[in-house]
Amino acid sequence: MNEFRRITQDPALMGGKPCIRGQRVTVGMIVGQIGAGRSIDALLADYPYLAREDVLEALRYAAWRAEEREVDLQHAS
């Protein structure tokens, strides 16, 4: 079993989405920013209450979730 100590889920916070340490920063936001080309250092500058390990664990969590379920993708014709 995977342990993600920095990832929390609370139905009362951000609609129950996975967040970083109970804060209003979602895993999806972190992954989206990195995917858009932002560096970890830039994220940490914008969110000084986050630690590098928070960002890395968010990426590991997202990768784990992606491996846990298959989603059919439509192929471009």
How would you name each of these model-derived features?
Residues 1-25:
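N-terminal first-folded block
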Residues 26-77:
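Long, charge-rich, low-complexity alpha-helical segments
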